[in-house]
């Protein structure tokens, strides 16, 4: 590993000291990936019936593919990657957003712009720079993804922020000091994870202006764990979670030994070749626990010292006191992430003394996918209020909120 990093460092001029020093966070390389014009984005918005009055399309955007050094869970350096969205033609300092994407099981990157890319563009065309980390083990990075583990997710984002400082110098970009964190689904969880990691370990390096977690599974050991015992639309979440948890917490010597046949061979094959989430779901039982041997299910149910409980508790994000404002958005009919995750997180953060944590209902009738549209819009309004001078955040422009309300009436579940 270190030999390969050394060769990369030699080839790219990266300071070799940074690879062995946990405090050294360095960009390895970047290249222009795509450019998007105002006209292209406006056309896309109109084709999807998004009111252009909701988003100011003011700038063309360059998107850079960035490779940088991050860290594995044991602190050793690993390669990581991400995309950096930069508005063109701005010389004034700009606010910065870290957008955390939802669950992915495949490495690499689609060559076309997908749904979450347009959420990033929604910020960038209005004058925000946007980082979208691939997370450890995804994109073009090394190792495998430690799904729903807050320290790994947060570390990938923090290291990307350090790398972006260097890239800003190369591109002549200035930051205005405002840092916003957001994301959806696993990304909603990851945005709050990054907030926690910065507050715990990097408060001298970064100051979070505000975070907006959208449809995140924050209550890992509580509300979200209940899906294991009932019919669930995305059963692949369980083996994905167990794969990463076993790497860090050593729950069992061989994680594949806990599965009933034929899942004991199908699961490592599907995850090993980076199958699409839908393909994995099709070979798994509707009730997630049915893929696991009953002896392990009973250990989980009856033994509070079973290591899985510690793994879930360590990675629940409901029991800490954020120092900066946070908005938690949810939708009542979300079939993948129980909306009560946001309720529980909000209640416990307030109990611990957090003063500026708010709830936002993205829609009582929407499921997981349509909730992403409205939670993204509410996040933009929330972040804009800080850019416009609010200290603790507001709901946003009244006219735009009215347009959103009309859209919610028009768009079916």
Where are these regions (language model features)?
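Catalytic-loop region of hydrolases
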Residues: 19-91
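Gly/Ser-rich "nucleophile elbow"/oxyanion-hole loop immediately N-terminal to the catalytic nucleophile
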Residues: 86-93, 162-182, 201-206
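Short beta-strand/loop motif that positions the catalytic acidic residue
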Residues: 322, 327-334
